[in-house]
Amino acid sequence: MPELRQEYLDILEKREWSVSGYTDDGCVELEWWSPAGEDFLVCVNVENFPDEILNYSDDFDPDEHIEMWVEARANGRQDVPGARRLAKDAEDIQKELDELAFELQEAERKL
């Protein structure tokens, strides 16, 4: 089962991400706590990890993320913050993903 390079693990740790685990199909599950307290999980392939994170960042849709949580709140979930906080948090998540992708791409160039 492939695992992440130490250089990538160091970047994740510095940015307060943790590895939750590896899957049998070659993926890694990452966990990060957003400023609003969301337990944000990302699952990507270990192979070409920097590109996988870049693609995830490019595909992340803050509006879709906000809508998911607004719907959860409408369906009775109690721990969802208000719309303004959700909007700010989605922006913060996008920023974190972009910065993480950039740092990983830079590390990849140096290898």
What are these regions (language model features)?
Residues 1-37, 74-77, 107-111:
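Negatively charged, low-complexity tracts enriched in Asp/Glu with abundant Ser/Thr
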Residues 5, 83-86, 90-100, 104:
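Long amphipathic alpha-helices with heptad-repeat character
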Residues 10-13, 55, 87, 105:
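Compositionally biased amphipathic helical and low-complexity segments enriched in hydrophobic
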Residues 23, 41-43, 53-55, 97, ...:
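Generic local-structure boundary detector
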Residues 36-88:
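Intrinsically disordered, low-complexity regulatory segments enriched in Ser/Thr/Pro
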